[in-house]
Amino acid sequence: MNEFIYPEARLIAGVDEVGRGPLVGAVVTAAVILDPSRPIVGLGDSKKLSEKRRLALYDEIKDKALSWSLGRAEPEEIDQLNILHATMLAMQRAVAGLHLSPDFVLIDGNRCPALAMPSRAVVKGDSLVPEISAASILAKVTRDREMCELDLQYPQYGFARHKGYPTAVHVEKLAQFGATPQHRRSFAPVRNALLDAELAAAVARTL
């Protein structure tokens, strides 16, 4: 990792999100305060790690961190607030869920949610800041597992494979089967699938 200059603070939490781009499911966030006396080797951007390595680190982070917490914003909240504001809300929830209150919070990206303590946004923080890397891993493993569970409920969409992202297969299945209750209605491919279904139903009624 490149050298990162930390703020002067005792308890530093890293925060990251997973799931802003998918058409289905919650956006999931995590907040992590690492224990300097129990270092975790191999932390990195969760998207660049193998699934096997991610799962091993997931268990190690939960075991060794001073405090960790998950937050989320559901599809209904995403549709109501928009994805940016829903993500900020989910980050606030993750920080609020920590059983230790951090002195400073480092957020992956270029924007910070409103928090009770000082914070800083760190572009590419998931590859620069171990606390953010740890949060990224917790959030991704959690959300991927939720997509696998949703796949069992709706196997025809292939959620376990594409994790809800707008792949050609996912968009094709949306057109074929329509939207599930977990789909984000405000996202264009879902909205278009719903409109097409309404139009087809209206045409069918005239026949």
UniProtKB/Swiss-Prot annotation:
Domain RNase H type-2: 10-199
Chief subcellular location: cytoplasm
Family matches, as Gene3D superfamilies: Ribonuclease H-like superfamily/Ribonuclease H
Residues annotated as binding a divalent metal cation: 16-17, 108
GO biological process, one term: mismatch repair
Catalytic reaction equation(s): Endonucleolytic cleavage to 5'-phosphomonoester
Listed cofactors: Mn(2+); Mg(2+)
Record keywords: Cytoplasm, Endonuclease, Hydrolase, Manganese, Metal-binding, Nuclease
Localization per record: Cytoplasm
E.C. numbers: 3.1.26.4
Single GO term (MF): manganese ion binding
Record-level GO cellular component terms: cytoplasm; ribonuclease H2 complex
Cofactor note: Manganese or magnesium. Binds 1 divalent metal ion per monomer in the absence of substrate. May bind a second metal ion after substrate binding.
Pfam families membership: RNase_HII
Similarity comment: family membership: Belongs to the RNase HII family.
Biological function: Endonuclease that specifically degrades the RNA of RNA-DNA hybrids.
Protein name: Ribonuclease HII
Source organism of this protein record: Erwinia tasmaniensis (strain DSM 17950 / CFBP 7177 / CIP 109463 / NCPPB 4357 / Et1/99)
